[in-house]
């Protein structure tokens, strides 16, 4: 299966969302 640029971009965003949420949560907890 060939990945298009759009699919790669979507996968990248979806993988970054949980990391961003965890990072922000960690910042809130360590205030």
Curated annotation (Swiss-Prot):
Disulfide partners: none
Pfam families, per database record: PsaM
InterPro entries on file: PSI_PsaM (IPR010010), PSI_PsaM_sf (IPR037279)
Origin: domain of life: Eukaryota
Acetylation as UniProt keyword: no
Transmembrane regions: 7-26
Subcellular location: Plastid, Chloroplast thylakoid membrane
GO biological process: photosynthesis
GO cellular component terms, A-Z: chloroplast thylakoid membrane; photosystem I
Signal peptide coordinates: none
Membrane topology: Single-pass membrane protein
Keywords from the named record: Chloroplast, Membrane, Photosynthesis, Photosystem I, Plastid, Thylakoid, Transmembrane, Transmembrane helix
Principal place of residence: plastid
HAMAP family in UniProt: PSI_PsaM (MF_00828)
Family note: Belongs to the PsaM family.
Protein name: Photosystem I reaction center subunit XII
Gene source species: Phacus acuminatus
């Amino acid at each position: 299966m060939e990945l298009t640029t759009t699919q790669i971009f979507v996968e990248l965003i979806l993988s970054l969302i949980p990391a961003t949420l965890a990072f922000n949560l960690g910042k809130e907890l360590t205030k």
